[in-house]
Amino acid sequence: PSGHFCLTYVQKRKIPEKFFDNLYFTTNYEKFIKKLIPDCDKELVPDARLVIPFYDHYNELIAVTGRSLESGSKVLRYVTVRTNDSKDKLLFGMDTVDLNQPVRIVEGQLDSLFLNNCIASGDGNLSIAAKNVDCKEKILIYDNEKRNKEILKMMHNSIELGYKVVIWPDYIEAKDINEMVMSGISPDAIEEIISNNTFSGLEAQTRFTFWKRV
């Protein structure tokens, strides 16, 4: 309903309204998961969360992520639970992606909602996610965190593996797609930035070297 704090949260993050029907809310994530998956043995939190469902190519529910609506260093921001016993890499957005077109791969589920034909890894292991996507062209879009050693290591590895990687221009200060949108950059403008800053091979290595030093 209008004014609800979860609705206020997604509106504040400027999530496109067309996705509102695909997102859910629970006042108690632990109870929600126990009802959905009675034999779940994962440690859960009994707090209010935005619920983000994962579906496969066949529109079968394969997992859910609970995104905390609170902030703070002690808050576990994301809690993801599978609905099956699969060991495959979890990917968000596989129910809507067109594998005949270039596929963008980002870290965050909410970030993926702002880009065309985009899926999310749910973590920084984008090259592992890419291995699990059967399409001709994949573009890896890491968070804009040049001070994060883990991100740098994974970006370097992806470039070495030959993937196309986005090297964010220096004037971009936001750390991820959602923050860029919240700072006033339109999704269309972000699409253009991505298009103009996607590199592979030697050019990616060169630009990556300069980017991480700035």
Predicted regions, residues:
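TOPRIM metal-binding catalytic domain and adjacent DNA-binding surface shared by DnaG-type primases
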Residues: 1-51, 55-58, 97-98, 159, ...
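Short, exposed beta-strand "edge-strand" segments with a Pro/Gly-rich flavor and a Y/T-containing core
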Residues: 9-14, 82-95, 168-175, 179-183
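TOPRIM fold recognition
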Residues: 74, 100-103, 109-214
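Phosphate-handling DNA/RNA-contact segment within nucleic-acid enzymes
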Residues: 31-137, 150-152
